[in-house]
């Protein structure tokens, strides 16, 4: 059972039938209905006074009054009672008007409290959703940062590979220069060998010509020698014939001819041997020079072939290294472009996520500010409601303690038109108010759903003073 129902039930018990119509008018929240309703308690009040007078003039009550008071005291008490009744009538009229206003304010504040609770629930739901989104964004940002670190590591590794390939390329360029220098040296040596080969070929041709001329000369000399021998033989034969003819007369000529012939034979043999030795020596020298030149030419040809083979191998190796270098440079460029593109994409994604996170944080801060404002408003409303309740309870306590049984008969309508009925309704109203007072902290805790309900005593006193001034 809510506090509003308690207020309505207690109000019905106190004010009777006109309280039912006034409670219906309170829900409309209009000033005209409040003003028109404020006059009904006055009519009820006058009817209550008349009923109280009827009850007070009953014989049972007059007999009990004559037992306790004398006539003079009863006259003074009746005058004082009239004055007190007049004052109480005015006070009760003002209190009824204020009570109606307080009831309206309480109903309005309860409606606002419900609206604020619904708004707080929505804000809590919205607050939980951005926290979940921020958690997702932070996780995605961590993943992207890890990917970015991996890309940076890959980039550093690619940079190291690029530097290593650059060093290898420099070494290959140095080797290429060295091999080019060696090739030039080999070409120079080959040119020198070619010159030597040409010179050796010329020498060989000259020697061959010289050999041919020497062979011709040898043949000529042989021919001359043979002719000389033939002439000598002919001359010897003639000399023999002449010697034979003159043998008797000249006995020493034969011996002389023999001696001359022997000398010529020795001379011709010596000349033939020397010419043959010279010819053989020349042939041997020419053959040696030719073989020597052939060996040098063959060695030069072999060296040229080896240099050509090495040059071709180095050229192929240089071409392969150039193609590998170009491929690596192209791969490195593609990797750099890809890493730059991924870096830019990751930077854009990080920027978008940062913007979304910033927007979410701003929205969360705005919701928290609104939530704090609503909490402050709700706390102020709770404090004001508590102050109004304390004022109402204080008024009820004061009214019940000041007037006693006579005040209940004056201030509130009786259910059966008798004093005992007014007393029972007043007692039930007081008990209901006490129960509301006991249950009000628990109801405030249950309706706040975890929101702060406590307030400073100074604030409550200020609010109660303002309410009393109003």
Curated annotation (Swiss-Prot):
GO terms for molecular function: structural constituent of cytoskeleton. Residues 233-251 are annotated as: Linker 12. Residues 121-136 are annotated as: Linker 1. Residues 414-431 have a biased composition (Low complexity). Pfam families: Filament (PF00038), Filament_head (PF04732). Residues 414-470 are annotated as: Disordered. This is Low molecular weight neuronal intermediate filament. This protein contains a central IF rod domain characteristic of IF proteins but displays divergent head and tail domains. Keywords: Coiled coil, Intermediate filament. Residues 252-270 are annotated as: Coil 2A. Residues 91-123 are annotated as: Coil 1A. Residues 271-279 are annotated as: Linker 2. PROSITE patterns: IF_ROD_1 (PS00226), IF_ROD_2 (PS51842). Residues 88-399 form the IF rod domain. SMART domains: Filament. Residues 280-395 are annotated as: Coil 2B. One of its GO terms (cellular component) is cytoplasm. Residues 396-470 are annotated as: Tail. Residues 137-232 are annotated as: Coil 1B. Transmembrane segments: none annotated.
